[in-house]
Amino acid sequence: AIAGCVPINLTGGVGTLTPEMLGFSTFVAHDEYGYKMQQYFANISGDIVELPGGMMSFAAGLEHRVESGFDSPDALINSGNTTGNARTATEGQYSLNEAYLELAVPLLKDVFLAESLELSLATRYSDYSNFGSTTNNKIGFKWKPIDTLLVRGNWSEGFRAPSINELYQGVSDSYPQVTDPCSTTVYNTLNADQKAVCTSQGVQVGGYEQSNPQILTQVGGSLTLTPETSESSTLGFVWSPTQNFDISLDWWKIDIENTITAYGAQFIMDQCVVEGVDNFCTLFSRGPGGEIDSLLSTNL
């Protein structure tokens, strides 16, 4: 027994609960959380030289940034000794140094097939304490062959480092509803290869009766994450036949690699059993009867 605990008599009737009994039936959670960012920067901009299309200008700068954050749940919540979902602590930080340069280059103006022609150039160097350095560039143009038509385009590189939460988030419990493809509800719709996946995981032929669709799922950050990188291109035009009427048409393409996302529990199960992606099969475990014990959904 817990020292000082006064048991509740659930059959005692109305008015029999004392403050001493209630003192051990509920608690007031004391969570602490915080986020801090320190940022130092210096910027400069101005004109450089006169070109046929106008004045060439620039902008440049340096930046230093430190970000940190934490989430400290109540000790009872952290231990899982409550009727609510457990949650462990989150804490982490990183620092970043950056330098950038931008140029606006007006090449032509008021000449044949060039009412205006402008070029924009930009580059940014970033050095992360936890991911190393990267340089990302951008180039764009605006061209007005005639007064009523604007043609524009851009090409750029992108980089996004994982956030503190995506990296260091503590594990928390949730209970989403999941339909197991290996249960009797779905089993007969599977093909031979999919059924073989179920069998390899200890599920009996024919599937099992899934009595509880709410599966313990642990969600958290991942220190194995790598930065997202991207490359984007756009091309379009704006036609302005009258002063108050514009028609625009734009084409764009964005390629993203190493996308950071947290997959849902159902998606993980389907990818493993239905799609046959082995990596997802390592994110959950089964009991002796084939039922799902628990599932892990971290940022990937």
Regions found by a protein language model. Name each.
Residues 48-52, 107-113, 143-147, 229, ...:
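Outer-membrane beta-barrel strand-turn architecture
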Residues 1-96, 112, 156, 160-227, ...:
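Surface-exposed, low-complexity loop segments enriched in small/polar and acidic residues
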Residues 58-72, 93-146, 230-232:
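Surface-exposed extracellular loop regions of Gram-negative outer-membrane beta-barrel proteins
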Residues 39-45, 100-102, 122, 138, ...:
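Membrane-embedded beta-strand positions in outer-membrane beta-barrel channels/transporters
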Residues 22-31, 118-124, 129-140, 216-240:
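Amphipathic repeat-derived elements
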